[in-house]
Amino acid sequence: MKWETVIGLEVHTQLATQSKIFSASSTAFGAAPNTQASAVDIALPGVLPVLNKAAVECAIKFGLAIGATLNRVNVFDRKNYFYPDLPKGYQISQLAKPIVEGGALTIVVDGVEKTIHLTRAHMEEDAGKSLHEDFHGMTGIDLNRAGTPLLEIVSEPEMRSSAEAVAYARALHTLVTWIGICDGNMQEGSFRVDANVSVRPLGQAEFGTRREIKNLNSFRFLQQAIDYEVRWQIETLEDGGRIQQATVLFDPDTGETRMMRSKEEAHDYRYFPDPDLLPVKLDEAWIDAVRTTLPELPAAMRTRFQQDYGVSAYDASVLTGSRALAAYFEAAAQQSGQPKLAANWVMGELSAALNKAELDIGESPVSAVQLGTLITRIQDGTLSGKLAKQVFEGLWEGAGDVDGIIAARGLKQMSDAGELEKIVDEVLAANQKSVEEFRAGKDKAFNALVGQVMKASRGKANPAQVNELLKAKLQ
């Protein structure tokens, strides 16, 4: 039997506000336990929540960016459950009337575009953190995270493979960091993914029983967890077993998922409107004011890069992987006037150096202006591509500016016709066997002669001129 995978993602995005969603406590990461937990956060009797306006504006910005419907009146609800890191005994969330409904993101997998629709995005507060390994025989509770503003973004179950799920998660990560509503730091828990996974016989309309994989904090783990879960569900069904709806955890060490608890439904949480919070009303003036803060979005920029700079759809997608990367490329392209060459250098030499040094584009020792100048020197014939890589290494090491490194290291390309002709004549005289082989129809002999000329010129000869001279003399 052939099976079809069905995946929907729920992503908890920590909103980039200075204070929590219902209190004035700081959201800064890494503080000593319980030093950023106010009376509201620890649920002392008599305290009341006050909604953070900045968190609402982050949600509005996201809704606008995905072309969603913004509910002009949205309501906060209490989600009731007991857990030690939830001091109130309930979490403030949104169920019936979330702030964002609908919208879509476009992903590309193996060169094929696909639109993934979103169900909703709602605001809620984060819980605290249980510290199981910090105390012998006990569990500590850190409430610094309690009350941190989250936007939970729920997709439709429209992904059919782990590759599509990862592409969607990456696109969403790019978007929320691009528009500035989340720092995207997965190691610190700013972007956490829950994957709802089920399988069904190919062609069946009805969904299978889903299991939810919780708190995946890397794209690699997301792919591994889904792949394992799909294999497990198919094997279970083919062996005559049944899938029980459940919440599971992924163990990166074993590469397996394990059951955490049976999966709850909405009625298990006894949702009801929070009486301490009034409905949030969004007027057009407020929405329009937030709209003016939106930057050019990734999809629009991809289209513009293809139209204005002539780069391919794939290159445009890579170059808009982050707002900082897109800005770097555009600055280098404008500095050099050679956008395609700039794209090749950004995605090639620069990207490799950044990955090797484990640096982000914003930490690059080579500025966009420097790279643009380097590309200009290739274009005007001062440097060959091979020599340019040596100059790039110098820029990376902080050895000076482009022209200074060229001069100091004697890297200027040899373009003097008389000087080149002399070297070519010497190479032809010393390599008569290769000359005879070329004239006998062996094209590889020509490449060998080019190599000898480049070697004799210590890599400084202009390759195009070398080719022309050799062809002229070998006719």
From Swiss-Prot:
Reactions catalysed according to its record: L-glutamyl-tRNA(Gln) + L-glutamine + ATP + H2O = L-glutaminyl-tRNA(Gln) + L-glutamate + ADP + phosphate + H(+); L-aspartyl-tRNA(Asn) + L-glutamine + ATP + H2O = L-asparaginyl-tRNA(Asn) + L-glutamate + ADP + phosphate + 2 H(+)
GO BP annotation list: glutaminyl-tRNAGln biosynthesis via transamidation; translation
Keywords associated with the record: ATP-binding, Ligase, Nucleotide-binding, Protein biosynthesis
Keyword flag Cytoplasm: no
Domain of life per record: Bacteria
PROSITE patterns according to UniProt: GATB
Signal peptide positions on this chain: none
SMART domains found in the cross-reference section: GatB_Yqey
Matching InterPro entries: Asn/Gln-tRNA_amidoTrfase_suB/E, Asn/Gln-tRNA_Trfase_suB/E_cat, Asn/Gln_amidotransferase, Asn/Gln_tRNA_amidoTrase-B-like, GatB, GatB_C_1, GatB_Yqey_C_2, Gln-tRNA_amidoTrfase_suB_CS
Gene3D superfamilies membership: 1.10.10.410, GatB domain, N-terminal subdomain (1.10.150.380)
Pfam families registered for this protein in UniProt: GatB_N, GatB_Yqey
Catalytic activity, EC: 6.3.5.-
Molecular function, one GO term: asparaginyl-tRNA synthase (glutamine-hydrolyzing) activity
HAMAP family referenced in this protein's UniProt entry, alphabetically: GatB (MF_00121)
NCBIfam families (alphabetical): gatB, PRK05477.1-2, PRK05477.1-4, PRK05477.1-5
Subunit structure, interactors included: Heterotrimer of A, B and C subunits.
Role according to the record: Allows the formation of correctly charged Asn-tRNA(Asn) or Gln-tRNA(Gln) through the transamidation of misacylated Asp-tRNA(Asn) or Glu-tRNA(Gln) in organisms which lack either or both of asparaginyl-tRNA or glutaminyl-tRNA synthetases. The reaction takes place in the presence of glutamine and ATP through an activated phospho-Asp-tRNA(Asn) or phospho-Glu-tRNA(Gln).
Family to which this protein belongs: Belongs to the GatB/GatE family. GatB subfamily.
The protein's name: Aspartyl/glutamyl-tRNA(Asn/Gln) amidotransferase subunit B
Provenance organism: Thiobacillus denitrificans (strain ATCC 25259 / T1)
Name of the encoding gene: gatB
